[in-house]
Structure formats: C-alpha cells, structure tokens
A protein has these predicted regions:
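Membrane-proximal intracellular helices of multi-pass ion channels
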Residues: 1-308
Length: 308
C-alpha cells in the first residue's frame, strides 16, 4: 500500500507514470484488471477501505477483543466491489473467496476436532476457539499465537504452516502463493487431464466463468515454480548453516510467506534470537522476496533492467 501512494502522489510530480509501479506492487496474477479508470481513483478507494477496516478493527478490539484477520485475507478489490454495490454477493460470486473461506472452515473444523478428540483441549468451545484463532492467524499470515500450535498432534503444525502459503487471496494483506494462483493451477491441471482423455475437446482455463489468457496461466506457473525454488534454496542454505531439518523447513516457509513463527525453537513459543547472522540474513532475504512477489526483486538483478 505504501508504494501505491508513492506511485500516485510522488511520481506524477516527477513526470513519471505510476501505473507500472502500482502494477508491480499489487499482489496476484490478475494485475491488468482495474477497479476504476484512473490509478489515483483506485488507490484512493483501496485506502478508504483499508483505513475503514482498520478503524472498525480498533473499535472491535476495544469492545469485544475481536479480530479481522480473516477479512483482511480476502481480496481488497472484493471489499471495494461489495462497498460500491452495497451487496455481499460479490464475495459469493468470487471463486477465490469461496475457496479461501471453504479452506479456512475445513482447517478450523478439522483442527478443533483433533484438539478435542486427543484431549489437548477437553472443552469443545475452547478447542474450537483456539483452533479458529490459530487457523485465522496462520492462513492470513498474521502470525499471532494464543497457544503453541507447533506441539499439536496429527501433523496439524505442518498443515497450519502450509496454509500460510495457499489460503490468502490475491490483493489481500496475506502472503504466500495466494489462493487465486492455486485455483488457476488446478484449473490448468484439469485442462491437461481433459486434453489427455479428449484430445479434440476445447476446455479453456476459467475462473469465475471468465477465460484466463495463456499469458497469465504461464505467468502463474512460472511464479509458482520460482516461489518453490526460492523456498527450497532457503531450506538448503539454512541446512548448510547448521539448522535442523525441521527448523530449516519451517523457518524458510514462515519467512517467504511472511508468517513469522515456524516450528521447533522458532515456533510460536520461541523466537529467532539464537540464530546466527548468516541465518538471519537468509531469512531476511526470503521475507523480502516473498513480500515483494518475487519478480519485483529478481528483475533488479537483470542486466536488461539497468540498460538505458
């Protein structure tokens, strides 16, 4: 959001267009879609929504200790559409939002059942509340913790950690690959399976009944590959620096998704204080790469970028 204001308010004064910078800063593959005809109007509308949600969140915190993590993991463009049309149907009509909410509810319900079934939380209401908060925090990459979920049973810690990579929507405050990219990848896989069974069938990749251009599909696949390669490189570098496999994997994922807590000594009950300078620099690089959506960082190392 900060770069959006910079592109709208500062660059025009310098005679430099801000549209490309805003496009680079906006998360998600559908960056060509504009909510309003002008970049300034789009930035203004998104900031009104952002500040409005922040103000409501402050009031809700004060009155009832509520949190808005799940709301902020949805696409802010959907908030804009719902606000403009005075209707909540915009959320239901969005495949990405439905998948995000469905994934959240399934994770929360499964986690709550596991905590209650294993006796970790004997009270059903406490199990549900703790699970709900943990899933909302990890899925939205907020990083808050009301319990040390790294010690929960049935592989729940790994599921929660991986949820930080896929549940948040594009155009939200969350990190990771984003749900829209995951939906496009699965749609592309379905397209390939259909082509194998019916070679002459015409089955375009679609999201919300709209055909996704091949340019965007290839961009999503490239992004997913580079994202996974960056995370794997981080894991290998951390392993080489002396970290344990569990902590290397969790710290790398937690950093590139901007989640924060990982597993083991870097879990919700721990911190990164004991790590060496080399390990902290590796994780800092992953945080920067993940926050700026990869290509924005990697293009700086391209020789063509610096050519006049």
């Amino acid at each position: 959001m900060g770069l959006i204001v910079f592109s709208v308010a500062i660059l025009p004064l310098l005679g430099i267009g801000g549209a490309q910078l805003m496009k680079a800063e906006t998360s998600g593959p559908m960056k060509e879609t504009r909510l309003t005809p002008r970049v300034a109007e789009t930035a203004r509308a998104l900031y009104i929504i952002y500040l409005g949600i922040s103000a409501i969140c402050v009031i809700a915190y004060h009155l009832a200790d509520m949190n808005f993590m799940l709301i902020c993991s949805l696409n802010f463009a959907l908030h804009f559409v719902a606000w403009r049309r005075k209707s909540l149907l915009a959320y239901w009509r969005s495949t990405e939002a439905r998948c995000c909410l469905a994934a959240f509810l399934m994770l929360a319900a499964g986690t709550a059942f596991a905590l209650y079934y294993t006796g970790a939380y004997p009270e059903p209401l406490e199990a549900f509340r703790t699970a709900f908060f943990a899933v909302a925090s990890t899925a939205s990459t907020t990083g808050y913790a009301s319990a040390d979920w790294s010690n929960w049973p049935y592989g729940i810690p790994f599921i929660l950690l991986l949820s930080s990579a896929v549940v948040s929507c594009a155009g939200s405050t969350g990190g990771g690959l984003k749900m829209l990219r995951v939906a496009i990848i699965f749609s592309q896989l379905r397209h390939e399976f259909t082509r194998l069974l019916y070679p002459n069938a015409v089955t375009p990749v679609t999201i919300d009944a709209a055909e996704i251009p091949n340019k965007i599909v290839f961009s999503v696949l490239s992004y997913a590959f580079i994202w996974l390669l960056s995370a794997l490189t981080g894991v290998l570098l951390l392993l080489g620096s002396g970290m344990s496999p569990l902590e290397s994997f969790s710290a790398a994922v937690a950093s590139i998704t901007n989640l924060g807590p990982g597993l083991g000594s870097v879990g919700p009950a721990g911190n990164y204080q004991a790590l060496s300078d080399l390990q902290l620099n590796i994780l800092s690089s992953l945080m920067l790469i993940g926050r700026l959506e990869l290509f924005t960082v990697f293009v700086l190392f391209s020789r063509a970028f610096w050519k006049p």
